[in-house]
């Protein structure tokens, strides 16, 4: 019994001893853990300088500043990336394309000469200075958003005058014609020694040149070849065009007054000539008895022609033989164009009757005055394969002087406002199979011409007239889809008299601030305008060749007026220069 009790007591003592050692072990482990943790914290604070709560207050600010620095750096890098992309993906290919176009134009000119042995003098095809590569015959201002009339001309700039002037009081220099290609320009005018009203004899000045920039950056027109066609041939109403073989020119040959010519029974003689790069001039008479079989009078449009699809295209106009096939097909055809926000109050039937009569003015014996387009193949043989297109009078007004223009991939016909419609007209033109098709025109309501009553500048109703003056517009501003938005030109800002020449930029309804040649009483006549860009500086310029009154030496002096196109948002019309 006692043994059993002793055994139980021994087991209890052993169990208590084990529990005691377990407690001591646990306490020791806990203390060791606390010491280790404290040591670790102390080491961390010592070795890493751990922040206290007060130190953490400025951390968000520092993080924000760091973010700004990183964002700024990334933004700067993005600007660099954007500039690189613009240069590599957009500007460089465009510059290369423009350079390629100009080189190909020059090569084309050379190939024409080489293949046809057209130039035996050793003179090569000329070309403008590199600063103009890609800036001629292009859509110069492409802008979908800006107000067209926020673009305006500067004051006229001094530059080298490449146009000869009269040298006597009775001398008459008139009817300028100008065209410029990617490689060279062509210019011509008519010279009469005994006053502007003499129709019996005149001679023609014809010149070929290139655009240059001087050492100081000034633009000048450099004449390389010129000729005075002073012979027994009386060339009139000449139009010129820059082609790969030089300067092609279309003229009529006349010895009678315009009224007498329209009253004759045979077409007017016409000649296709060319001033080559070697300075030699050659010409050939066209077979007008076949080409103008249905015509009694036929004249070039005075304005420049255009080289399109290996052919040179000229505007022509004249009188049709009554009851001829060409005359009969136009019978009962007419078109009425309306002024912007200024409707004709006449009855519609009366308007139609007057519109039909406008094609047969009494001045020319009631002949139908018709618009047409003549294209000739450009080769070493002059007058080759001429094709005449006569557009329907459901599109064109009474025939008048005109100009063919090419800007970018678009072609246009300007028609002088000789009939009742005063605002400037530009007909879009498409070409195919040697013929042309005209479409409904762009009209520029503020770009008017003076005229005799009832066809004065403010006229709004159809009437029979032969009036107006040649003042062509040049396509300047386009939408990105290549639709025309605005033009540049020098108008005569008078109601009836040929007075007050003024340059401006025009949209369909209004005009920009203007640059006047002189006072509002300044007499003037024909103007023809062409725009181009100096690619190096990205500056756009426009040249207006204008007939300005010159009382001391001759009745007129032809002056090349040069302006830069500037931009000023919100500015409408003001005086400049």
UniProtKB/Swiss-Prot annotation:
Function summary: Mediates the viral entry into the host cell together with fusion/F protein. Attaches the virus to sialic acid-containing cell receptors and thereby initiates infection. Binding of HN protein to the receptor induces a conformational change that allows the F protein to trigger virion/cell membranes fusion. Neuraminidase activity ensures the efficient spread of the virus by dissociating the mature virions from the neuraminic acid containing glycoproteins.
Spans within the Virion surface topological domain: 48-577
Residues covered by region (Involved in neuraminidase activity): 234-239
Top enzyme class: hydrolase
Free-text domain note: The C-terminus (head domain) is involved in binding the cellular receptor.
GO cellular component: host cell plasma membrane; membrane; viral envelope; virion membrane
Reactions accelerated catalytically: Hydrolysis of alpha-(2->3)-, alpha-(2->6)-, alpha-(2->8)- glycosidic linkages of terminal sialic acid residues in oligosaccharides, glycoproteins, glycolipids, colominic acid and synthetic substrates
Gene that encodes it: HN
Name of this chain's protein: Hemagglutinin-neuraminidase
Positions glycosylated per UniProt: 119, 341, 433, 481, 538
GO biological process: symbiont entry into host cell; virion attachment to host cell
